[in-house]
Amino acid sequence: FDEKMESESMDYLEKAAEIIKDPVEKGQIYYRIADLSFENKVYDRALASYQQVIKNSQSKKQVQEANLRSVQIYRLNGDLDKATKTIKDMLLDDVFKPIFGSLELELVKLYDQQKMFTEANNRLESILQDYPKTKASAEAYYILGNYAISQEWDLLEALEHFGMVSREFSKSMYVKPALLRVKEITSYDNLIAQYDSYMDRLLVVDTLGVPSLTIKDKNDFATVIYGLAELESFHFSRIDSGIVYLNQLIQLTPNSPLYPKALYAKAIILDEQGYYK
């Protein structure tokens, strides 16, 4: 019902935009239609409306934004060649200079979508050099931080990149996600230190042959292992490593209260990976 109402509202706005003669007002209405449609992922309508904004709006900022959103829609619709060509053409036109940084980031996302990670990294590094202290450079640092995790598994480098986000542009929408990433990495490092300590103790027995880990110790150890499995699987997208930790919990601490939860988490992960198909 809500979707139908939204669609009808857009229909009425489009009719109004078609009738209105004043290009300024016409451009404003089409810009509103385009933004709402983009937010609701109705990309065909959004693209058509952004083209009308480009044609009618008297605002340079709106026209630039409409061009940027248009190439984003090409990418989201899978028209990667068109998106790439359009962006490269725009980067040669000084009319679009205020959004050059954003266009460069769109190229990064296009490269990423095609798994061209070397090209993406090179473009990100150039963004840091060419557009320092901007929204673009802040986002570039955030993406580089995620690449340090996903491509290199270098958490120290990731921390450095995430730490730069707020320094580059304190109002960036990536400041909070970067802080969350820092928190996740810090938690992971702390858990690894505890994990190593428990693993060392697990191998130690006293003179009577009694293991050094008490029942409480094993339950605490299970909590550490589960925390690592959760971070690996659901935060860092390292599914194989997450499964390794879950298997360890299942094998080493079968009497832990977390044992059933580990079995369930493993089943969910394997199901999502298509293991049971």
What is each PLM-predicted segment?
Residues F1-K277:
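Acidic, polar-rich low-complexity tracts and alpha-helical solenoid repeat scaffolds
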